[in-house]
């Protein structure tokens, strides 16, 4: 059984039922309060949403796992999606920015992050030799049976926890450190299976 999951806390988003319920998938929402939207099963938790996004619970999940942001509606068949997209580790190519320097400027300008803190993180990545395309981590397709994927998640979690707190900045670096190039699908593929809404 594969798992699709999302995280909604603080009333930040409205959970949307998938337009198509895909055979062989279970749907799980983590939230700080109970949400009743079938076919989603709800697990009430006090964990931070980014922690659940980055480090899915190995006791609950194995095999193929799909994370979607709470602002996303699933509109396509997930079995077709995993046939189209390599499932070791995949995410969406960022539609507006191409690299972490552009993302750094965006989180400073739009999210109010500390410039010195962000640039300290970015400089460390660039000095290490990192220069990979930018992902938009609103969708994450992972094979959690893969030990390299689990190690990447652990490093990504550590980078998120000990830096400026913007997970997209450290995703690509964490994959690169373990020699894994994530598959980044484009907006044509994204729009075939998902619909993005503004945060409620």
Model regions and ranges:
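N-terminal anchoring/stem segment of glycosyltransferases
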Residues: 1-50, 59-64, 162-166, 177-180, ...
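A residue-level signal for conserved active-site and pocket-lining positions in enzyme catalytic cores
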Residues: 4, 27, 57, 71, ...
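A short acidic, amphipathic alpha-helical/loop segment
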Residues: 16-18, 56-59, 77-82
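Residues that flank catalytic or metal-binding motifs in active/ligand-binding sites
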Residues: 23, 68, 135-136
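Short beta-strand-to-loop acidic/aromatic patch adjacent to the donor-nucleotide binding site
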Residues: 62-73
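Conserved donor-nucleotide/metal-binding helix-loop-beta segment in metal-dependent transferases, i.e.
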Residues: 74-109
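Catalytic core and acceptor-binding pocket of nucleotide-sugar-dependent glycosyltransferases
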Residues: 113-200
């Amino acid at each position: 059984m594969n798992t699709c999951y999302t995280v909604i806390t603080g009333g930040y988003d409205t959970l949307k039922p998938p337009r198509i319920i895909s055979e062989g998938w279970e749907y799980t929402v983590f939230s700080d309060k109970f949400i009743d939207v079938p076919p989603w099963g709800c697990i009430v938790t006090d964990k931070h949403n980014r922690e659940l996004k980055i480090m899915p619970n190995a006791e609950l999940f194995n095999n193929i796992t799909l994370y979607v942001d709470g602002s996303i509606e699933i509109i396509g068949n997930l079995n077709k999606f995993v046939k189209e997209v390599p499932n070791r580790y995949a995410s969406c190519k960022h539609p507006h920015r191409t690299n972490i320097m552009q993302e750094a400027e965006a989180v400073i300008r739009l999210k109010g992050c500390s410039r010195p803190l962000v640039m300290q993180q970015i400089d460390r990545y660039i000095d290490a030799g990192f220069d990979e395309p930018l992902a938009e981590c609103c969708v994450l397709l992972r094979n959690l049976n893969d030990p390299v994927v689990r190690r990447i998640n652990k490093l990504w979690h550590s980078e998120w926890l000990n830096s400026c707190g913007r997970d997209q900045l450290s995703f690509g670096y964490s994959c690169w450190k373990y020699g894994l190039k994530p598959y980044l699908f484009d907006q044509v593929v994204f729009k075939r299976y998902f619909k993005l809404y503004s945060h409620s």
